[in-house]
Amino acid sequence: YLVDHMLVCGINYFVPHAFSPKYPDADCPPHFYARGTNSQYPLFRELMLYTKRMAHALSGGVHVADVAVYYNAEAEWSGGKYMLQQEVCCELTRNQIDFDLIPQDVLAASECREGKLVVNEESYGALVVPYSQYLPKRVTDAISRLLEEGLSVLFVDQLPDRTSELLPVGKTLERAEIVPLK
């Protein structure tokens, strides 16, 4: 079940490991063999063969996600109120909307082509920005530029009050759509 769940979520590289060959070692589980006392050990080979086969079949493809979520690593340090991006990610996942997290340096270097956010070889139809009272100026400048270039930008709950540098965010952000989390 866990392997299938991870595969469905896009994980296709697995490194199974046991932390300590000493058994029993309560501080370092799991023990795959456990001196023959692990009743599931004979099935472990089958699980690993299945995992290898599925991971191989699902690798090398082109990932398509239509939504980019701004990864606001600076939110906690900005001193204001903020929403964890996990809240937005959970809501998107519950509604089966695939997404990628985009940090500020990648967002600042991105461009908009034909109404889509283009990052490396990926393109996204919308950028979702979790609520944050303050956003770095570099981010508000990038979002303003992307809005002017025609990207659909959605701020969750409300626009930021100011930049992290305590500067006004500018009028361009007002063109973005404000949406509730749920």
Predicted regions and their residues:
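Carbohydrate-binding surfaces of carbohydrate-active enzymes
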Residues: 1-182
